[in-house]
Amino acid sequence: MEFHMTLDFRDDFTAASVPWTAERLREYIRLVADLGMQGIHWIEMGDKEMGKWDRGSSTDLTGGARAFVESVPDPLAFVCEEAHHVGLKVYAVHKINDMASFGPGRFYPLGTAPDVLPGIPQIGGSGQMAFRWLREHPDRRVEIHPSLLEAKGIRKPVRTIRFWHETDRLQGVPYIELLVSETNARYTPYRGSCRVDVSVRRRTPPVFAPAPERRFAKEGEFACIQISGLEISQPFFGIRFAGAVGLTNTLTALVEVEDVSGAPVVFTWGFFPRSDYSTSLGTFEEAGIGFDANWLIPFENHPGGHDWQHSAGRYRLNVDKVPFIGIARGRNRFLTSSVELAYPDVRRWLLDIVQYELDAGCDGVDIRVESHTQNMDFENYGFGKPVVEAFRDRYGVDITRESFDRGAWRELRGEYFDLFLKDASELIRSHGKETWIHLTAYPSMDREPRQQSLSQIYWNWRRWMAEGWVDVVNFKRFQARNLSPGQQEEIDRFYRKALNFCGELGLRTAYTPNPRFEGMREEDFVDMELRTIRRIAGDGFEVYNFYEGCTYIRLTENGFQVNANQLWREVREWNRKAGLPPRS
């Protein structure tokens, strides 16, 4: 079994306080070889001309990545040349759904934003790092169901906000504080008229349903906190309770907002201060609110993780467990970084990036479909014009206005990925290189069209393999800490099913673990990793891909600090027994 390691230009270069140079990267690659690796999987953000590191990048706070790209305009070509010198192969990790920064809460530290923001539009954001092509074509991202967008026209001020409890009994209501903002950069107390009433009212509460459907529970009596007589003209406001309130409900049924005419207001949720990606800047009054972002929200039975692919509306929230509730008028029309593969020019652009990776000297391309996009409503995205038109042509149904078969919709969306993968495979093989594909278990790709799935797409993984589009299947997210027994059992079933299918077809397999050093003693971490390596080798995998470089190696003022040295001694011994020569 070979050992590879994933290196991430983003994490290694933007997280380091020490400047990277060409010589340091060269030393890094040699160090990786010396640890016993035979391959590098390079998560890169493009060369200088692709524009991902233009000035104002929200995740390059120190400017280290931009400075490096100025001196080494094509980092991937540099990596390939240096890696090949020491006998390492290089595989470009092509993350097709991470073509922009991940969350709408990301922004520039105060006073550092450029005059012209380089990013793509998001509610409450002040710029999102993205490839230049995507910034120039923001409508090529995955699009929301049109029924959920705010109607065009002049916004009327907000007059009423209602908070609904899930029963007719609510403990005492503490003082309520309202704060408002024009820019989501600084919040100030609301100074207008305001009246707070607590009562029990009859209501038919809404239940979450993907658009355009609407569902309701049984009519009943429910406790209601009504804040009325308002005159809020600002697009952003926050509500904070000064003490415990015991207010609990599903997100769909929790809040109603009306304007001065009594019409419902379309809005986006926010529950935590925005971040500068590396650290929180403190309270939302000074930092702003991370709208439409699902991190750390204490929902009951929430699946968790940045790759959560359900919508938040169905989950139950105790308001006592969040510091405030933020409201932004309107909805994000597009997801941050997920592209709409139904557009031919999107697939062409992604193929152009494959060509760039091949021209740089890569030995293969490792295609990954996971998205880091942080969004609270995944089920209501995927309604770009070509999807709508194709569904209407195939089934005679207008999915923007009528109820529709969501399984057929997921299946259709999956066909566009199949088109891309087939073309990418043909391009890669025409250069004599290898096509790798990530197979993901958490969230699972092993879903039927009728089931919830990663990005609400049917991933027809058996077809990819049976059609011969793939050379190596890379198993990723088949382990994670803090999973329920039921989740792990489901993952294990998929593992066996996929591994057996690969065996029947004679496909090579790789395994990418999901370790994290944080919160573990080094000896426990090493023991966990070694047990996984032995299990994976016993199951017949050809590659174990350590994930990722910054977990094990850190650049410091005194050079590179290598963690888990016992692990690398074991890896070198494994290579020695396999008859592999030392690399240096």
Stretch-by-stretch model annotation:
Residues 3-19, 65-69, 97-173, 188, ...:
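Active-site-adjacent "subsite" loops/lids of carbohydrate-active enzymes
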